[in-house]
């Protein structure tokens, strides 16, 4: 498939994932024919597939998202193993968010930011405006009560945002995006986890060589040894991969 406005779907554990060849393909897909798609973007890695397997609510949230894409190298390798002809590459969520913001700045697309600490959010806004002239029409840090959610949704709707990015971690961000779409459906939503922290330099990402080798997970483990328990869960995913139970 060579049409940049289209992309094949590949199923892993019953979830259809978009197969993007590279970042350019992803952007052309999301901005097909000059029209930004509407729906929810969810980055899929091995850990998220495991969580979806064990938690029906998380699985339902992920399944309902229109645009599920391979964020983790293990997921990319599983797609290639199950579908040998697949032309799919890893599109890291943090990189996709930056590319999306750059494109939004170029086209004047209105953006609303949710999540993060107040100081991190303020720095994110300032850097986006300085770096790409992003049209930020509103923001809300991650410190709000359940009772304040509806007011936030109303603010997002009133802002006219066409892109809403939510940095609250999974599954909180997926829950918020699902509920916000009931009030403001005509936008592209993206859950971005800790991306604002990385973007503003508060958290160091793995060097490019580690990323290119598909070893970003190992860098994070070496930097944060307490992640070992989370990483041990991935042995189950490896069993799926090597036994073909995908």
Swiss-Prot record:
One of its GO terms (molecular function) is lipopolysaccharide N-acetylmannosaminouronosyltransferase activity. Keywords: Glycosyltransferase, Transferase. GO terms for biological process: enterobacterial common antigen biosynthetic process. The keyword Transmembrane does not apply. Its EC number is 2.4.1.180. It catalyses: UDP-N-acetyl-alpha-D-mannosaminouronate + N-acetyl-alpha-D-glucosaminyl-di-trans,octa-cis-undecaprenyl diphosphate = beta-D-ManNAcA-(1->4)-alpha-D-GlcNAc-di-trans,octa-cis-undecaprenyl diphosphate + UDP + H(+). PANTHER family: PTHR34136, UDP-N-ACETYL-D-MANNOSAMINURONIC ACID TRANSFERASE (PTHR34136:SF1). Catalyzes the synthesis of Und-PP-GlcNAc-ManNAcA (Lipid II), the second lipid-linked intermediate involved in enterobacterial common antigen (ECA) synthesis. This is UDP-N-acetyl-D-mannosaminuronic acid transferase. It comes from Salmonella schwarzengrund (strain CVM19633).
